[in-house]
Amino acid sequence: MPRSLKKGPFVDDHLLKKVDVQNEKNTKQVIKTWSRRSTIIPDFIGHTFAVHDGRKHVPVFVTESMVGHKLGEFAPTRTFKGHIKDDRKSKRR
């Protein structure tokens, strides 16, 4: 179920402060974060976040089309290696 509109989007305070500081200084450094649950707001457009996927930090450059989504949606936590091919010749012998 989506979040109530009267509450507004959830963004961690420390993340919002880091973005505000960079906007004041007009710098665009990578912001390292573990907050996958934070919603992307219009203030984040143009910034790069290093979102933790459980193992490493994945760089995510925020564009207009990402607004309203969560940061964790753009840093997958599982790597799919593919299914193993079924080798029938070796099973028969």
UniProtKB/Swiss-Prot annotation:
It holds the Pfam family Ribosomal_S19. The keyword Ribonucleoprotein applies. Gene3D superfamilies: 30s Ribosomal Protein S19, Chain A (3.30.860.10). One of its GO terms (molecular function) is rRNA binding. One of its GO terms (cellular component) is small ribosomal subunit. Disulfide bonds: none annotated. GO terms for biological process: ribosomal small subunit assembly; translation. Keywords: Ribonucleoprotein, Ribosomal protein, RNA-binding, rRNA-binding. The keyword tRNA processing does not apply. Protein S19 forms a complex with S13 that binds strongly to the 16S ribosomal RNA. Belongs to the universal ribosomal protein uS19 family. PANTHER family: RIBOSOMAL PROTEIN S19P FAMILY MEMBER, SMALL RIBOSOMAL SUBUNIT PROTEIN US19M. This is Small ribosomal subunit protein uS19. It comes from Mycobacterium marinum (strain ATCC BAA-535 / M).
